[in-house]
A protein has these predicted regions:
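Cofactor-binding loop segments of dinucleotide-utilizing enzymes, especially the Rossmann-like FAD-
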Residues: 8, 42
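A short, glycine/small-residue-rich beta-strand->loop->alpha-helix junction that serves as a flexible
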Residues: 9-22, 48
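Low-complexity, intrinsically disordered short peptide segments enriched in small/polar/basic residues
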Residues: 19, 32, 60-62
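A short, Lys/Arg-enriched amphipathic alpha-helix followed by its capping loop at the start of a domain
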Residues: 25-35
Length: 96
């Protein structure tokens, strides 16, 4: 089985509530059961540099909206056997 887990937060990268605990632990447990899990979340500005420096840039692209040409980047970090993909966009995720 393949699972793409989308979340707004995950431990240890960023935490504001209980969702981060689940998003940080559930994928690890599913992997132990043989599930192929990938986690996708925003690349918030407040994610610690110790994690950011280990991320690999996968791609970047632009989305044309009515009023602007919007950048989005995709970064990857394998952490504790889980592949995390971070979506970079300063306008939406450049906050703490």
């Amino acid at each position: 089985m393949n699972v793409l887990y989308l979340t707004s937060e995950a431990v240890p990268f960023i935490k504001t509530g209980g969702l981060a605990d689940v998003a940080g632990s559930l994928p690890k447990e599913l992997i132990k059961d043989g599930v192929d899990v990938r986690v996708v979340m925003p690349l918030y500005a407040s994610i610690d540099e110790s994690y950011r420096s280990k991320m690999e840039k996968i791609t970047e692209f632009y989305v044309d909206l009515d009023w602007k040409h919007q950048y989005a980047g995709v970064y990857k970090l394998d952490y504790q056997e889980v592949s995390f993909y971070f979506i970079d966009n300063l306008e939406y995720f450049g906050r703490d």
